[in-house]
Amino acid sequence: MLKWHGLAGNKLMTSNVVGSIHVVGKDHTFTGMEETPVAFVEWKVPSFAFADRKTQEGYFEEAINIVHEMSGGRQPRDRIFINVVHAVDGAWNFNGKAVTNAEIGAEVAKAG
């Protein structure tokens, strides 16, 4: 994800990307009201992230490919769903302190 925002290798952002895996049985996931094995990728990010179309398209294609390949090709690409949840400006935190988008930008620039 950082690559698509021009932040690959940025120490501050790398240390603040947090992920989790939630395994949900296929008998608990549905599309069209039918049990369907699906995969979800979700990001919770500051409100400026994923703002341009090139980043959205590039990241989504790459993430879908990764999930599809990790499944050994068993997970259909059309059953891999991605969404991005934006935090309100000021409702993000670094080191236990709420920060605004401007403060994030300043910290990212300092971290190089």
Question: Across the structure, where does each feature detected by a protein language model lie?
Answer:
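A domain-level signal for the structural core that forms small-molecule/cofactor-binding pockets
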Residues: 1-112
